[in-house]
């Protein structure tokens, strides 16, 4: 293996531009003020060095050492990419898997394989055709993930489309477009907003929750703010804060755990409505399918509309809601309250607003010249720089752009 070395002039940070690579690329930052390219003797890339900028082309398999202060740009890569410890990184198109760690500003176009990121600053991604995994990032903005997505310890998170399952642990606010699998979100420091979740959803430790549509079941635990949700399955709400206003609609059953505190209940159900006697509710209207009740004076309001059954119990007694309750159940319309005219309809859930002046889950992408990109991919295939499988994945990715 031979090497090419380029020393920085003055206090320059360094810039590396790789226009096309047919093999695997490994780039590692170091404290030295120089750039070194390691490659086989027969596969030396073409390099031009001018003004602390290194332009590299015709790369097969290569390893590069660059200053940690350097910015790196990879236009197209036919193999796998690994980058460690650089100030900024931009990748236009990657046919293989991509692993990135300790990267400052990160901008990615299309990754045809899996993408793994650890310790990054601002992250912007157009499309990942495989799975996405991120551990620690200042902010994340994603257009499309064809596989599943797993994120830990991130700042504000926006994802437009996730075709697989989504799992988030610790985020400073989450904005989602469509999730075609299940969604699991824990410890969201800000608000959670989602347009569509086609599987089940589980939410824990979050401020405000707004879900326009959940096709499966919904479980919410430990909410600090309000909940607005439309669910086609069952809803389980554990410990809703009584000081907030909530509106939920379910095609299935609803289980509601009340936090001790003043609140007004407005419940409509096609099935039965039951509540635990220990709650001490003051019933205002009680029919077989409707209940208006109050706990204390003032507080928030909880609006429930269910096609199935509704059960209300003290927060923290989830097991009791399936049995008799601590002091037995009271059932609406069982003769313990007068029949009254229908109560006013439950308020509709407003459309999901923008977050911070940016459209929800929106990702701004530069325009793509599809004809030019397809020509480049086919040329790389003809020259043997990428395999037929890699070319097919890249062409499929362009078709989704």
Task: Specify the residue positions occupied by each region the protein language model found.
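Intrinsically disordered, low-complexity terminal regions
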Residues: 1-401
């Amino acid at each position: 293996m031979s090497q090419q070395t380029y020393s920085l002039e003055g206090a320059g940070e360094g810039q590396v531009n790789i226009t096309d690579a047919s093999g695997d690329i490994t780039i590692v930052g170091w404290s030295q003020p120089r750039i070194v390219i390691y490659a086989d003797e027969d596969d030396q890339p073409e390099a031009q060095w001018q003004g602390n900028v290194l332009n590299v082309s015709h790369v097969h398999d290569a390893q590069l050492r660059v200053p940690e202060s350097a910015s790196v740009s990879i236009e197209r890569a036919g193999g796998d990419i690994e980058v460690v410890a650089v100030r900024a990184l931009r990748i236009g198109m990657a046919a293989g898997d991509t692993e990135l760690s300790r990267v400052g500003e990160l901008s990615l176009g299309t990754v045809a394989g899996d993408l793994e990121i650890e310790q990054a600053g601002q992250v912007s991604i157009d499309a990942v055709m495989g799975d996405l995994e991120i551990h620690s990032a200042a902010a994340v903005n994603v257009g499309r993930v064809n596989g599943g997505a797993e994120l830990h310890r991130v700042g504000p998170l926006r994802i437009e489309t996730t075709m697989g399952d989504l799992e988030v642990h610790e985020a400073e606010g989450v904005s989602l477009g469509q999730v075609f699998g299940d969604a699991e979100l824990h410890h969201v420091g800000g608000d959670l907003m989602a347009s569509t979740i086609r599987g089940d959803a589980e939410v824990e430790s979050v401020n405000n929750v707004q879900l326009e549509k959940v096709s499966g079941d919904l479980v919410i635990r430990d909410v600090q703010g309000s909940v607005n949700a439309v669910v086609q399955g069952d809803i389980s709400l554990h410990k809703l804060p009584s000081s907030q206003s909530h509106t939920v609609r379910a095609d299935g059953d609803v289980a509601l755990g009340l936090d001790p505190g003043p609140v007004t209940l407005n419940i409509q159900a096609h099935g039965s409505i039951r509540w635990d006697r220990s709650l001490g509710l003051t019933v205002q209207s009680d029919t077989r399918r409707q209940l208006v009740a109050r706990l204390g004076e003032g507080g928030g309001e909880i609006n429930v509309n269910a096609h199935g059954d509704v059960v209300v119990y003290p927060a923290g007694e989830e097991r009791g809601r399936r049995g008799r309750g601590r002091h037995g159940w009271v059932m609406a319309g069982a003769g313990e309250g007068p029949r009254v005219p229908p109560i006013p309809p439950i308020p509709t859930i407003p459309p999901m607003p923008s977050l911070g002046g940016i459209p929800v889950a929106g990702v701004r992408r530069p325009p793509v010249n599809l004809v030019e990109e397809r020509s480049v991919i086919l040329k790389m295939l003809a020259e043997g720089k990428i395999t037929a499988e890699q070319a097919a994945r890249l062409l499929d990715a362009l078709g989704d752009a």
